[in-house]
Amino acid sequence: ALFELYELDQTDLTLFATGGYGRGELHPFSDVDLLLLSPNPIDEALNQKISPFVAKLWDIGIDPALVVRSVEECDEACHDDITVATSLLEARILAGNVVQAGLPMQLLNKNWSQTKFYEAKMAEAKERYLKHNSTEYNLEPDLKNAPGGLRDIHTCLLYTSPSPRDRTS
């Protein structure tokens, strides 16, 4: 309803849930990962429409982790960053131009073969393990990033699905 209230439905923007919200795993006190995707470059007039929408999200108690990108910018970011690619894999349309609903997967498939994606996820996990070495013995272990944490569970779910998009949470 906020998307329409701020007349973002009158634009070519599409609002996607990504991350935990895209997976349907929003936890208490989590930020809400969102992607606003435009087929055209983001100009100042569009930014002027987006700003009050984001402010209202904050006002009603939502902690948005919002990314605003054109399709071209998203394509470039996806090509270079496994984190962006993963967010596109988990993207779920919330509002806007339904014609763009499949764009996140199209961008992912354009830039990443399944093998390349899985290899990058494994490299990401190895890097995370080095960073969080032996943190499972800390007084307050990092349940999200430490070995055996939520990030590993999500990676396992990706590996055990016939297609990454087919996996269930």
Regions picked out by a protein language model, each given a short descriptive name:
Residues G19-G22, E119-H132, K144-S161:
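Core structural elements
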Residues A1-N47:
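Active-site nucleotide-donor binding segment shared across nucleotidyl transfer reactions
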Residues Q48-A95:
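Conserved catalytic core of two-metal-ion nucleotidyltransferases
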Residues Y159-S169:
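Single conserved hydrophobic/aromatic residue that forms the stacking wall/gate
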Residues T86-N138:
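C-terminal or mid-to-C-terminal helical accessory/interaction module adjacent to the motor/catalytic core
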